Design a protein with these regions (language model features):
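Short secondary-structure capping micro-motifs at structural edges
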Residues: 46-49, 67, 94-95
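A short, conserved structural fragment
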Residues: 34-44
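Short helix-start
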Residues: 42-62
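Polyanion-binding surface elements
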Residues: 1-32
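Basic amphipathic alpha-helical segments that dock to polyanions
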Residues: 30-36, 52
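Low-complexity intrinsically disordered segments
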Residues: 1-5, 87-208
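Alpha-helix N-cap/helix-initiation sites
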Residues: 19, 23-26, 45, 50, ...
Length: 208
């Protein structure tokens, strides 16, 4: 998928349901992310002559979702950048499953971090789930005796992806956004090397 800045802005504004009276506030937030050098490798801003990709669009959509929960912009963009491989795997799975319209529910779980860093802390701050693993491994926790914290955010990756693609086509006038080769590449990468933090589809094969 290739977008101009105008298409990127229009798609994100529609995704976030930005009221026309608030478009100036939205653009100010986009400039704030530019100052944070997010997404990495691009210079977000009106009039910048460059091409944006599905990855840039989705990184911004995810960051805005996290910022919307009250997390500071710097913390949100740092989290998306650090764990982008995990979001990428979720979108790759969602894309392939949406094509078959079955078992397409794909979730990214963002677990609460301890206020004070500790040795051996859980690295699975961001994990990928299907409906089964979300129910069995996330929604049933934390047990009172478990060490896990109660705070978490669950992002519906399949819904986000499908909505962004639809708006990129309808509002941004991007041609065939859902057929972006990036999505197929992410899906293929996940299929070939599913990681331990990816619990969907029964999790990665256990080596013997």
């Amino acid at each position: 998928m290739e977008l101009t800045y105008k298409q990127l802005e229009a798609t994100l504004a529609a995704y976030l349901n930005v009221h026309p009276d608030k478009i100036g506030t939205f653009r100010s937030r986009m400039k704030q992310l530019q100052r944070l050098e997010f997404p990495a490798g691009v210079n977000i801003g009106r009039g910048v002559r460059m091409t944006y990709t599905a990855e840039h669009l989705l990184q911004l959509a995810v960051a805005f979702e996290i910022i919307g929960t009250g997390l500071a912009a710097k913390s949100a963009t740092d989290l998306v950048t650090k764990y982008w491989e995990r979001f990428q795997a979720a979108f790759g799975r969602a894309n392939s499953r949406l094509g078959y319209r079955e078992d397409f529910e794909t979730f990214v779980c963002l677990a609460g971090q301890p206020p004070v860093a500790r040795e051996g802390s859980n690295e699975e701050i961001v994990s990928v789930h299907d409906l089964t693993s979300l129910t069995e491994q996330v929604l049933c926790f934390p047990r009172p005796e478990a060490a896990a914290r109660a705070g978490m955010q669950i992002l519906r990756a399949d819904y986000l992806l499908e909505r962004v693609n639809r708006l990129a086509g309808d509002v941004g006038q991007v041609r065939s956004p859902k057929w972006s080769p990036e999505y197929r590449a992410w899906s293929k990468k996940r299929d070939e090397d599913q990681q331990l933090w990816d619990y969907a589809d029964g999790g990665p094969p256990v080596p013997f």
